[in-house]
């Protein structure tokens, strides 16, 4: 199975990617991991990517595409893969399609974990973390026993900067702008499968599994 995973921040993509990877024995490939590995190993592509990142610039599409294509040639991808964080643009999606076609392969499905903005806001802005021991909480779904204090070390729990309402709204807006053209691209090719991400983790995974196994 060759799949890509789409979804807004806070949709639970990481959790589902782990479950899919384990059940179907395919690698979960994230662009962040690819960048980090190539940079730490000082590969030619990694050195180029680091030059852009050190300047605070976005890594160009062409370089990102080369890095992903290189990763997809590895032995563990022969039976399939799950791409997370790529493609982000229609240009990248077209490049992925071209790469797969040239290797006599095709994408089986583009999974979209769909979650309304109001749900994401509640899920992400409610997150709290202990700055001392790292324990995680949620003011609605998993609150500490004593309000505002960590169960483990009794320190005051905090909201990370990434989880403030303003930051979350901005991330959702960026995601919507970037992803809608991709949704249209895969929908036009009948490769898009939309999953209701407001369900429980188990329900979302069951829906995805049924779709994957129906596609085999």
Curated annotation (Swiss-Prot):
Superkingdom of origin organism: Bacteria
Ranges for region LID: 126-163
Binding site for AMP: 31, 36, 57-59, 85-88, 92, 160, 171
Catalytic activity: AMP + ATP = 2 ADP
Pathway: Purine metabolism; AMP biosynthesis via salvage pathway; AMP from ADP: step 1/1
Keyword annotations: ATP-binding, Cytoplasm, Kinase, Metal-binding, Nucleotide biosynthesis, Nucleotide-binding, Transferase, Zinc
InterPro entries: Adenyl_kin_sub (IPR006259), Adenylat/UMP-CMP_kin (IPR000850), Adenylat_kinase_CS (IPR033690), Adenylate_kinase_lid-dom (IPR007862), P-loop_NTPase (IPR027417)
Residue numbers binding Zn(2+): 130, 133, 150, 153
Gene3D superfamilies (alphabetical): P-loop containing nucleotide triphosphate hydrolases
Name of the top EC class for this enzyme: transferase
Coiled coil (UniProt feature): none
Span list, region NMP: 30-59
Subcellular location: Cytoplasm
GO molecular function terms attached to this record: adenylate kinase activity; ATP binding; zinc ion binding
One GO cellular component term noted in the UniProt record for this chain: cytoplasm
EC code(s) of this entry: 2.7.4.3
Residues where ATP binds: 10-15, 127, 136-137, 199
GO biological process: AMP salvage
Location (main, coarse): cytoplasm
Similarity field: Belongs to the adenylate kinase family.
HAMAP family, A to Z: Adenylate_kinase_Adk (MF_00235)
Self-association state and partner proteins as the record states: Monomer.
Entry's free-text remark on domains: Consists of three domains, a large central CORE domain and two small peripheral domains, NMPbind and LID, which undergo movements during catalysis. The LID domain closes over the site of phosphoryl transfer upon ATP binding. Assembling and dissambling the active center during each catalytic cycle provides an effective means to prevent ATP hydrolysis. Some bacteria have evolved a zinc-coordinating structure that stabilizes the LID domain.
Role description: Catalyzes the reversible transfer of the terminal phosphate group between ATP and AMP. Plays an important role in cellular energy homeostasis and in adenine nucleotide metabolism.
Protein name: Adenylate kinase
Organism per entry: Clostridium novyi (strain NT)
Gene for this chain: adk
């Amino acid at each position: 199975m060759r799949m890509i995973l789409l979804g807004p921040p806070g949709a639970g993509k990481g959790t589902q990617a782990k479950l899919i990877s384990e059940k179907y024995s395919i690698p979960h490939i994230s662009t962040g991991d690819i960048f980090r590995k190539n940079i730490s190993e000082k590969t030619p592509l990694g050195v180029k990517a680091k030059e852009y990142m050190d300047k605070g610039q976005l890594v160009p599409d062409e370089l990102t595409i080369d890095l992903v294509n290189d990763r997809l040639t590895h032995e563990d991808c022969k039976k399939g893969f799950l791409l997370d964080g790529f493609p982000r643009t229609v240009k990248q999606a077209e490049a992925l399609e071209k790469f797969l076609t040239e290797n006599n392969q095709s994408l089986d499905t583009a999974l979209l974990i769909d979650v309304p903005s109001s749900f994401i806001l509640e899920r992400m802005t409610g997150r709290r973390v202990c700055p001392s021991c790292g324990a995680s909480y949620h003011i609605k779904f998993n609150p500490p026993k004593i309000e505002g204090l960590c169960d483990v070390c009794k320190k005051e729990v905090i909201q990370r900067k990434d989880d403030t309402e303003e930051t979350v709204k901005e991330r959702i807006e960026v995601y919507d702008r970037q992803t809608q053209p991709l949704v249209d691209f895969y929908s036009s090719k009948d490769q898009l499968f939309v999953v209701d991400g407001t369900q429980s983790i188990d329900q979302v995974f069951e829906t995805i599994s049924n779709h994957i196994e129906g596609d085999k």
